[in-house]
UniProtKB/Swiss-Prot annotation:
Species of provenance: Hamiltonella defensa subsp. Acyrthosiphon pisum (strain 5AT)
Subunit (UniProt): Part of the 30S ribosomal subunit. Interacts with proteins S7 and S18. Binds to IF-3.
Name assigned to this protein: Small ribosomal subunit protein uS11
Keyword terms: Ribonucleoprotein, Ribosomal protein, RNA-binding, rRNA-binding
Underlying gene: rpsK
Domain of life the protein comes from: Bacteria
SUPFAM superfamilies (UniProt xref): Translational machinery components (SSF53137)
Length: 129
């Protein structure tokens, strides 16, 4: 007797009108994560995962491409507004915000949450080239 085919349940994507975009811009890479209000991750993208390797990962264009890929991944959620939280001193800080704006999302606030040490760990030594 033949087995009945197993049907996969179609996941229903819930409508989330406003979300939070976390941008971690380091000197070597840019990580973009979009979460809902509770902090549940909806989508993420990196400059390295977007096809950029080596020193090209740390460019503003690579960060822009990562933000566009992340914005495209959450189109089905019906997001209208984004709150952007930026961490780090990297070159992809402004370009990710511009990419989100160009993707059609209304940005309600841009917050800089870069961690600043109050005389914490010793920084790495200066580069001599």
């Amino acid at each position: 007797m033949a087995k009945a085919p197993i049907r996969a349940h179609k996941r229903i994507k819930r409508q989330i009108p406003n979300c939070i975009a976390h941008v971690h811009a380091s000197f070597n890479n840019t990580i973009v994560t979009i979460t809902d209000g509770q902090g549940n991750v909806l989508a993420w993208a990196t400059a390295g995962g977007s096809g950029f390797r080596g020193s090209r990962k740390s460019t503003p264009f690579a960060a822009q491409v990562a933000a566009e890929r992340c914005a495209e991944a959450v189109k089905d959620y019906g997001i209208k507004t984004l709150e952007v939280i930026v961490k780090g001193p990297g070159p992809g800080r402004e370009s990710t915000v511009r990419a989100f704006n160009a993707s059609g999302y209304r940005i309600t606030s841009i917050t800089d949450m870069t961690p600043i040490p109050h005389n914490g760990c010793r920084p790495p030594k200066r580069r001599r080239v």
